[in-house]
Amino acid sequence: MALKNVIGIDHVVVMVRDLDEAAETWKRLGFTLSPRGTHSAHMGSGNYTIMLDPDYIELLGVLTETELNAPARAFLAKREGVERIAFTAIDSAAGAEEIRTRGYQPIGPTDFERPVTMPDGRLLAARFRTFQWPVAEAPGGVRIFACQHKTRDTVWIPELMKHANGARRLKQVLLAAPEPAKEAAHLSRMIDRKGQDQLDGSVIVPSGSDRADFLFLTKEQLGRRYPDVPLSRLPERGCAGLVIAADLAATETALGSGGIRSGGAICAPPASSNGTLLVFVSA
């Protein structure tokens, strides 16, 4: 039975070494970014968000070393890119108990916040309560956690949801794995969602509700899907990229010569987006 207090993908976390430099990189790709946020001291992190509907992309950097950001620092020692993926939690405390009954020792719930300057100048707070599956449980090399938004109106701000590149929502998260079926089965157990075998040996795992799916495939299979895109910087195991539903006419204009046509998609190679392949497809 699927988890009751955890629904589909909420956001993806792109770990970056230089937060402000990364923000400029993603602005050049045609994204609208939130003002820079600083999380509660025990988190030791700062971020920019790229708000879509109903999900988003978070650029996250470590500002101060803390116990809670040790896994993120270990990831950054190797590379940049998507380090973890959040599910939407209806109730983080109840969700943590749900996974406990399934044999996973949750980390948290953890409460934190960050100040938000609203478009009208008011200074408010975005408040969250999260819990994580155990760090060792990382299907496809990616950690997963769940995020309960206590103040959605300070996160999904309409002015931040309009992007020059036409981006609208996440459609798929691409996870490279030498053994896609094994990694997909791991995630399926963790979230109680059945995988769907594809003809080429890749596996789709729905995240829940109408949210983006996970697609597990080998790096070789990924290369066959996007043959004209340089993928050498991507790992053999880990999150390779994001498929984003968009207005492709706007995408083409925003990316210009930096966009690579591949079939019906327009791609930004990992080298241009902090180690994350971006695949824009028609919304």
Protein language model regions, located:
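Conserved catalytic-core motifs of GNAT/GCN5-like acyltransferases
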Residues: L33-A41
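Glyoxalase I/VOC metalloenzyme domain signal
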Residues: A2-I9, V14-L33, L52-D111, M118-A283
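Conserved beta-strand edge residues that scaffold enzyme active sites
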Residues: S40, E113-R114
